[in-house]
Amino acid sequence: MKFFIDTANINEIKEANELGVLAGVTTNPSLVAKEGVDFHERIREICNVVEGPVSAEVISLEADKMIEEGKELAKIAPNVVVKVPMTTEGLKAVKAFSDLGIRTNVTLVFSAVQALLAARAGATYVSPFLGRLDDIGHNGMDLIRQIAEIFAIHGIETEIIAASVRHSVHVTDAALNGAHIATIPANVIASLVKHPLTDQGIEKFLADWEKTQEK
């Protein structure tokens, strides 16, 4: 499973990229709005930092306008992936983008059949939302597993991005249940590195070393 970071903050992206594990970036209008910067310029900045796919979301809800927006986004850099909501109009846009050779990430997926529809329309990626399903008492991992099984049975190459990741257990379970990618906020990425026993081990090694230097 690959790691993407879910942010529009350049510093967070640069820090994650230095870890050597970052394979891509996902953004959304809310994340860019928090940064208070021009949307297209920020996507350009991100693409200059990261070589992997960078998802940039359309704002329009009508297919023709999504297509116009997506074409402009795709011009920013070759690694831009146009992010499209899972709607009837979104599927129309995904088909058009697929015909144009523009990669897409279908977002706000909450059922296996939505993922299948998106894949058949030509989506490069589908993004099931784990945390939001958990919030309403559903098991997001069941959805990841269902999508992975359906894609495997039918030889579908669309990749599954586990989104709305809240904690390290989500990351582990997504990997176990067949997600190709997990897109993760910066604070969760930081938490993945840490374990209390690792910290204790380092402290013990240092203490033991200091004792040898006192002799």
From Swiss-Prot:
Gene3D superfamilies: Aldolase class I. The active site is at 83 (schiff-base intermediate with substrate). It is found in: Cytoplasm. The keyword Transferase applies. It comes from the Bacteria. Keywords: Cytoplasm, Pentose shunt, Schiff base, Transferase. CDD domains: Transaldolase_FSA. It is an enzyme of class 2 (transferase). The keyword Acyltransferase does not apply. Pathway: Carbohydrate degradation; pentose phosphate pathway; D-glyceraldehyde 3-phosphate and beta-D-fructose 6-phosphate from D-ribose 5-phosphate and D-xylulose 5-phosphate (non-oxidative stage): step 2/3. Belongs to the transaldolase family. Type 3B subfamily. Transaldolase is important for the balance of metabolites in the pentose-phosphate pathway. This is Probable transaldolase 1. It comes from Bacillus cereus (strain ATCC 14579 / DSM 31 / CCUG 7414 / JCM 2152 / NBRC 15305 / NCIMB 9373 / NCTC 2599 / NRRL B-3711). The gene is tal1.
